[in-house]
Amino acid sequence: MVEQDPYEIVIKQLERAAQYMEISEEALEFLKRPQRIVEVTIPVEMDDGSVKVFTGFRVQHNWARGPTKGGIRWHPEETLSTVKALAAWMTWKTAVMDLPYGGGKGGIIVDPKKLSDREKERLARGYIRAIYDVISPYEDIPAPDVYTNPQIMAWMMDEYETISRRKTPAFGIITGKPLSIGGSLGRIEATARGASYTIREAAKVLGWDTLKGKTIAIQGYGNAGYYLAKIMSEDFGMKVVAVSDSKGGIYNPDGLNADEVLKWKNEHGSVKDFPGATNITNEELLELEVDVLAPAAIEEVITKKNADNIKAKIVAEVANGPVTPEADEILFEKGILQIPDFLCNAGGVTVSYFEWVQNITGYYWTIEEVRERLDKKMTKAFYDVYNIAKEKNIHMRDAAYVVAVQRVYQAMLDRGWVKH
């Protein structure tokens, strides 16, 4: 597990970015603090008639650029510090993508595996009743995150509508909803689809003519890992030579079929022992001789211990925080092009934004329109960051922070919240 306090990391990253730009002390001080922190108590009647009391949070880090946006996590070890850190990262993620949002995040300390569906519904509705006064389609828009899903979003939206006595625009109160009640096409593949566009552009700046025949290894075979394997092989002609999950990985130099591997994983509980492939460890996967490496599982997998052994030319951070700051330096020295997490995996929040736009306007797009608009957004964001990195000769992560912080700072200046 992560040993550093998550919010301390946020402050360090912000201070580091400030070295590469002109920003006033007072603005920096402002950005180090969330604008609103809400802690709520949620009593829930359990199926056996007893009442359990849960603690929930909603953090709105900064709303200079628009309503705050961010997921709701249900986790037994949820902490306020983690929620604060993730809310700040949403501020940077929405800013780097140039979405008209600020950053928010929510969480409930709960082990959802111990709840029945009816108990989950009561908890979801209770949470919305508790935070009702600080959310709205124009103030703070939640979404699914760890251990929450479209069904939970549907209950939450329904509760919000019941209290507010409003219909259609209330669809926009929450994103990541089922398609039947205002969800967007393309949302389920959005994180991987967005990452694929950044990998395509990274290959161009490295002078590759095509991705066809190039190799990729993907750590993690959840939603993002599976869709990335499918998209990179089927749409870009790449060879997916290795994938893994928490139990281990598989390698086949001739390439793996994404759908067949998923079927195997669903039937056997892991990708391991997939026919025609060699079993490898997660550690071995990271050090394979491949063109692109995509960590799409957990944080801090590339560290100062193994960074020197990374052989990929592009590291696409589909997971949050998969590379430690020390490892960043080593990869940069090695000339590896890193696509930082809050750029690489921003396809999810971007399609959430598209969902909100469709809800507010009442006009829904085809899957082709969603993908085309996502492509434009991801491509522009990639070059916004890459050009700063080149111009200042700094790491892509530092450049992404500079782009994001500069945009938030400008909004704060224009509002008169801070001075130059």
Swiss-Prot record:
It comes from the Archaea. It is found in: Cytoplasm. It holds the Pfam family ELFV_dehydrog_N. GO terms for cellular component: cytoplasm. PROSITE patterns: GLFV_DEHYDROGENASE. GO terms for biological process: glutamate catabolic process. The active site is at 105. Keywords: Cytoplasm, NAD, NADP, Oxidoreductase. InterPro entries: Aminoacid_DH-like_N_sf (IPR046346), GLPV_dehydrogenases (IPR053388), Glu/Leu/Phe/Val/Trp_DH (IPR006095), Glu/Leu/Phe/Val/Trp_DH_C (IPR006096), Glu/Leu/Phe/Val/Trp_DH_dimer (IPR006097), Glu/Leu/Phe/Val_DH_AS (IPR033524), Glu_DH (IPR014362), NAD(P)-bd_dom_sf (IPR036291). GO terms for molecular function: glutamate dehydrogenase (NAD+) activity; glutamate dehydrogenase (NADP+) activity. The keyword NADP applies. It catalyses: L-glutamate + NAD(+) + H2O = 2-oxoglutarate + NH4(+) + NADH + H(+); L-glutamate + NADP(+) + H2O = 2-oxoglutarate + NH4(+) + NADPH + H(+). Its main location: cytoplasm. Belongs to the Glu/Leu/Phe/Val dehydrogenases family. This is Glutamate dehydrogenase. The gene is gdhA.
